[in-house]
């Protein structure tokens, strides 16, 4: 099995958004962060042989990271058809043979029922854009309804919200850690070539 560093290298070929939409907060998950999240999930036996669901897969970074760690299958959900098409191409670049089901759908209104235990991995919208406040709440509601365990990336300072949401919806935060998230200049309101934003990653166990 690849080490975390090797997994990061495998994910370095994943192409990002061709035409990112600021309103949808389409920022590619950095390979280093994706590898860290997937490696942690693997250490907890939450990937191998399981069904993994990536809500808001974008161009497939977390989906493909999970696919490289031996799951039974991965279900990748994305509302925007353009990055989803890029994700399908990224699968070819990465070279995984794990079954991946690409689903163009709203992750906050998931149109399927999954009978087996599910691990969710996701980097949802942070709700940083005007009118998008609390955008990750809808994603978490889906997680609470389908997952037995989840790994999700959120804006720094989300601890109280995440813990309260988990408590109210049959979940328990078991692990949390800070992580740097490098954002490239891809929108008109970005002044720097790139910048780092502070994020937090949460592992939550759910009873549903």
Model-derived features with residue positions:
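S-adenosylmethionine
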Residues: 107-203
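Conserved SAM-binding strand-loop segment of SAM-dependent methyltransferases
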Residues: 96-107
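Conserved S-adenosyl-L-methionine
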Residues: 56
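Conserved SAM-binding motif I beta-strand of class I
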Residues: 73-78
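Conserved SAM-binding loop
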Residues: 87-88
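Conserved Rossmann-like nucleotide-cofactor binding loop
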Residues: 82
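S-adenosyl-L-methionine
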Residues: 1-53, 62
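Conserved SAM-binding loop of SAM-dependent methyltransferases across substrates and taxa
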Residues: 59-71
């Amino acid at each position: 099995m690849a080490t975390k560093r090797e997994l990061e290298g495998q994910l370095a070929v994943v192409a990002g958004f061709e035409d990112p939409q600021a309103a949808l907060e389409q920022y590619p998950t950095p390979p280093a962060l994706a590898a860290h999240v997937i490696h942690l999930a693997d250490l907890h036996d939450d990937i191998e042989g399981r069904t993994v669901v990536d809500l808001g897969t974008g161009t497939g970074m977390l989906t493909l990271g999970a696919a490289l760690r031996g799951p039974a299958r991965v279900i990748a959900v994305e509302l925007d058809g353009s990055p989803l098409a890029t994700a399908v191409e990224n699968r070819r670049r990465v070279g995984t043979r794990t079954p991946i089901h690409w689903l163009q759908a709203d992750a906050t209104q998931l149109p399927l029922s999954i009978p087996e235990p599910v691990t969710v991995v996701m980097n949802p919208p942070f709700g940083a854009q005007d009118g998008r406040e609390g955008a990750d709440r809808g994603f978490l509601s889906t997680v609470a309804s389908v997952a037995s365990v989840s790994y999700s990336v959120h804006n720094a300072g989300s601890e109280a919200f995440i813990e309260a949401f988990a408590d109210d919806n049959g979940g328990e935060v078991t692990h949390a850690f800070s992580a740097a998230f490098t954002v490239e200049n891809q929108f008109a309101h970005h002044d720097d070539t790139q910048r780092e934003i502070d994020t937090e990653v949460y592992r939550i166990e759910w009873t549903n």
